[in-house]
Amino acid sequence: MISMGEVRICIQYYDSPCGRLVLASFADRLCLCDWSDNPFAERNMLRLTRNMKTSFKTETTSVLEETKRQLDEYFAGKRKAFDIQLRLAGTDFQHEVWNALLDIPYGATKSYKDIAQCIGKPKAVRAVAGAIGANGISIMIPCHRVIGSDHSLTGYAGGLEAKRVLLGIETQI
């Protein structure tokens, strides 16, 4: 039961050129930027409520408004890096993988194998792929920059067309 004054996860939506994103913040940090039609969005939201021991409410916050502003700049080709405080909900291994994603430069790509090697676990390619798939902060933790070893576009929570658009923004194709 939620008590009066308990901090809850605030949620808003952002309509991007690639589809609708669900944004959430908790304690002045962004904790979710996920594609609303992602089949795993519900799982990511459940992970947040368990991790933070609270529930969602539809309300804006300064963090969510700033996130929307920075996303607008990104989609307009005016922003290459995000300056939003994040609150990640995941395992230590997932955090390690997500931090490796943050090191992929704007406009560059890496393979799942590259990420596995970056974190010192070269045989953990499938586990790395699973951690990338569990990323609940799309675009800002740039899982769209991960491609197949053969340079093919591979799965993405927002769909391959969204991945193509995001990479196109970053490479000015």
Language-model regions, residue ranges each:
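Basic nucleic-acid-binding alpha-helical/helix-turn surface characteristic of O6-alkylguanine DNA
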Residues: M1-P122, I169-I173
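Short, hydrophobic-biased amphipathic alpha-helical segments
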Residues: N44, P142, A162-K163
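Regulatory, non-catalytic segments
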Residues: R126-N135
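Short Lys/Arg-enriched helix C-cap and helix-to-coil transition segments
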Residues: I139-V146
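…primarily DNA-binding HTH/wHTH and HhH modules…
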Residues: S149-I173
